[in-house]
Amino acid sequence: DRMEGYLVELEDSLMNFRDVEHRGVVKKEQEIIELFYFKFMDIPLLSRMDAVAEYFIDEVETLKGFDLPDEEREAVKNRFYRMYETRDLYVLYNRFLRQEGFPSLPQVQYEKRKLRYEDVYPVLYLKYRLETQQEDSGVRHLIVDEMQDYSMIQYLIIQRLFKCRMTILGDREQTMDGEQQDVLTFLPKIFGKDIRRIVMNKSYRNTVEIASYANKLAGITEVELFERHGKPVVEKEFPGLEEALESVVRELRLEKQAVIAENADEGVEDIISYETAAVIARTADEARETYYILKEKLEAEGFDT
């Protein structure tokens, strides 16, 4: 909503109209304003002046009875473009950030500009709202997976980019975001109320034990579990990360000698170990610390890490 308000504001604040004269043909400021805000009002803001310039050039060519050379046409267009205070999306987005009280982007030379990940999609949205875009992408059906990881502004961009039928699927409980969002609350506002919702509630990826445990943590109750059983999930507490990872190494059967000792009554060829294993942490910092501790422990056991 704040971005939409900013776009409306730009319609006036970005413009500085003036008379234009070329080869004795004059287009008054008021005439340009009427063309800009009425005749060509459906064209995006930063592309609209191009239509006004072409309109004026056509008038000049009609009155003079010949076509203007390409270089002359470009020179006339540039005079119209200068009625924009700026056409630089980086500058326009920076102005929006300051206006909303957010940290500004660095004021650096063009070739040194960089956008943070969280700024990429707002800038893209500005671009697709302010500039004319090619309508037909050639895509006839678009599939969006992991729907829960897309923000509202990303869906707005998708809706503008692709005018085809779509299948959007995902699991809101599996979001990578820090805060859970239900995209179904805003998808109808973007794609219209005729969207068809299909709920698939049969879990097949995990064993009954793992799925039941995960669903209990997430507060999920309306799920039908695929009847495939495995070992029960075990919860353990440890005084620290070091001790927890020692248990992880043992539990995942990565310490060869420990596995053999624990299963002395079995033949070595009968002992099950894992080719791959995963340790999941809650944060990037925890994952980094876990990695270094595990790396040291596994290297001590002769594993190539």
Which role does the model predict for each range below?
Residues 103, 128-141, 148-305:
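Conserved helicase motor core of SF1/SF2 NTP-dependent helicases
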Residues 4-141, 153-155:
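Conserved helicase NTPase catalytic core signature
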Residues 1:
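Inter-Walker segment of RecA-like/P-loop motor cores
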